[in-house]
Amino acid sequence: MDRIHITGGAPLNGVIPISGAKNAALPLMIASLLTGETLELINVPRLADIAALTRILGNHGVDHMVVGKRPGQTTETGQTIRLTASNVIDTTAPYELVSTMRASFWVVAPLLARFGEAKVSLPGGCAIGTRPVDLLIMALERLGAEIEIDAGYVVARTKNGLRGAEIAFPKVTVGGTHVALMAAALAYGTTVLENAAREPEVVDLAECLNKMGAKIRGAGTPRIEIEGVARLNGARHEVLPDRIETGTYAMAVAMAGGDVVLKDTRADLLHSALDVLSTTGAEITQVEGGIRVRRNGGGIAAVDITTDPFPGFPTDLQAQFMALMTLAKGQSHIRETIFENRFMHVQELARLGAKIRLEGDLAIVEGVDRLKGAPVMATDLRASVSLVIAGLAAEGETQINRVYHLDRGFEALEAKLGRCGAQIERVRA
């Protein structure tokens, strides 16, 4: 199993290109099932999750083609893919495929909307009553779907097509909003989503669907209106920049020190996180086509955060920010309100010398003068990259095991950091 070795202490200086957002690319790829024409997606990151979804779509009969590189493209600048669902042969998504990635459950929406039926495995580990897919199922039922749970599968049918309806989500759900957008795009009549997710990735999906012929208004606000159409067309769409990757590298610079331009990204995608970083002492400025992050000397100020749905502080940056706070001057409080069990990185950061105390959904971080490298183990995607950030600032060598988690969400991480002066290498098993 691959490992990453980091020798800490080197500041980061240079330019890091930001990839297309995985969390936007996944629903965009799934939306290809809504039409028999070709959907061309530009700036799709090369990630394990993208490859997994490609296999899942292929199981349904979707043709996949990677377009040749344009002049100046590298393996770090994303890929252009063409997806054509003109010959869908199967509306069943089996457990062995869906279990590799939870987002793949979303195929239930376009399959049901276009073909009138779908049989999709529940993601692994879902217990009745606490399934994270409950709100997605609720949205489809509001649109007229007949749904039953049978032997671990969600079986969805509609006799005469989906019908527009008002869907009021009891809590903000990105997945539920994605599913409702795709299903309602081909429903009869008008659908209104209340308390819809406002994330940039939701806006990106709506913009792509509109290019395909959908009629969606209000994406990016809590109220979205979708006027259903009879069919959707092919389209060409560029995936928006990855705000989580942007914030991750910004926090790496804030922790290790240095001067880095994050290019091909947008500050408006993560204002809350950048504002917090500025408060810690990092200097954040917008430059043409990107963001410049500097921290040359001076300590790291302790700052309290609470994770919230967009436009609040992203839960997907919580672990990275906690790594930064381990070297802050004073005490910081980090409250996680989006997901349970999202403090799995705490005990691994402690192996590097961090002082963190947990009280329910609150982590209390006492800043220390230094971290010291040690062997650590990645437990999930965001936790794994928080260990990378900590390792960059720690004294000595940090060895990160189970780095396959990183490959799910960070494209060419070692190459991007290495070119900015980080002493980082992957040791292949």
From Swiss-Prot:
Biological pathway: Cell wall biogenesis; peptidoglycan biosynthesis
CDD domains tied to this protein: UdpNAET (cd01555)
Active site: C126 (proton donor)
Binding site for UDP-N-acetyl-alpha-D-glucosamine: R102, R131, P132, V133, D134, L135, D316, I338
A molecular function (GO) term: UDP-N-acetylglucosamine 1-carboxyvinyltransferase activity
EC nos: 2.5.1.7
2-(S-cysteinyl)pyruvic acid O-phosphothioketal PTM sites in chain numbering: C126
Gene Ontology terms describing biological process: cell division; cell wall organization; peptidoglycan biosynthetic process; regulation of cell shape; UDP-N-acetylgalactosamine biosynthetic process
Superkingdom: Bacteria
Keyword Cell division attributed: yes
Catalysed reaction, written as an equation: phosphoenolpyruvate + UDP-N-acetyl-alpha-D-glucosamine = UDP-N-acetyl-3-O-(1-carboxyvinyl)-alpha-D-glucosamine + phosphate
Record-listed phosphoenolpyruvate binding positions: K22, N23
Disulfide cysteine pairs (residue numbers): none
Key words of the record: Cell cycle, Cell division, Cell shape, Cell wall biogenesis/degradation, Cytoplasm, Peptidoglycan synthesis, Pyruvate, Transferase
Protein's cellular compartments: Cytoplasm
Predominant localisation class: cytoplasm
Similarity-based family: Belongs to the EPSP synthase family. MurA subfamily.
Descriptive protein name: UDP-N-acetylglucosamine 1-carboxyvinyltransferase
Organism expressing this protein natively: Methylobacterium radiotolerans (strain ATCC 27329 / DSM 1819 / JCM 2831 / NBRC 15690 / NCIMB 10815 / 0-1)
The encoding gene: murA
